[in-house]
A protein has these predicted regions:
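Short acidic/histidine-rich active-site segments
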Residues: 88-110
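Short, basic, glycine/proline-bearing loop/turn elements
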Residues: 63-67
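Divalent metal-binding pocket/active-site signature
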Residues: 1-62, 73, 80, 129-130
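Short, acidic/turn-prone active-site loops that include or flank metal/cofactor-
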Residues: 50-51, 70-75, 95-98
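Short amphipathic alpha-helices and their capping/turn segments at secondary-structure boundaries
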Residues: 77-87
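Mid-to-C-terminal alpha-helical segments outside catalytic/metal-binding sites
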Residues: 14-18, 114-153
Length: 153
């Protein structure tokens, strides 16, 4: 029931805004509808593995953060996101074993996650014309900034 889902989504956004908690969004197929709600609740939003050309600029203009998923090397839509999103609001993710298995079209072992993240980082370096080392530094800063906590290393 979309009416119930919409009402609950709005309640969650209001709760997160009230208590200043970031919101992680999986928007696949509901990008336009979610955007309308987000405009009413100022907050920190992280858009998980966005791959839609439509409304990308609107999400950027709202100050949203974005993750780039493991399909980056093969998916032009995700490459477009990696090219357009401000570098200081981007994070890299694997989205877990099943997502990596889906992207790779084969069974992926947990020990491969590091290599998959590195491959995505190299692709972002290429797309953004930035050194891998500089990008690593930026991703650490981004993560610290988004969660509001410094890492002890």
């Amino acid at each position: 029931d979309m009416t119930l889902q919409s009402r609950l989504f709005e309640q969650q956004l209001a709760f997160a805004q009230r208590y200043q908690k970031p919101v992680i969004l999986h928007l696949k197929g509901r990008e336009k509808e979610a955007l309308e709600y987000l405009r009413h609740y100022e907050n920190r939003y992280l858009v998980h593995w966005y791959s839609c050309d439509a409304w990308l600029q609107e999400y950027i203009d709202l100050g949203c953060w974005f993750t780039v998923g493991p399909s980056l090397p093969f998916d032009e839509a995700v490459q477009h996101v990696a090219a357009c999103v401000p570098l200081d609001r981007m994070l890299v993710e694997t989205d877990g074993i099943s997502a990596c298995t889906w992207c790779e079209n084969r069974k992926v072992a947990p020990k491969e996650h590091g290599a998959i993240l590195k491959r995505s980082m190299h692709k972002i370096s290429e797309i953004r014309n930035i050194s891998y080392e500089k990008l690593q530094e930026q991703m650490v800063l981004n993560c610290e900034k988004f969660i509001g906590q410094r890492f002890p290393f």
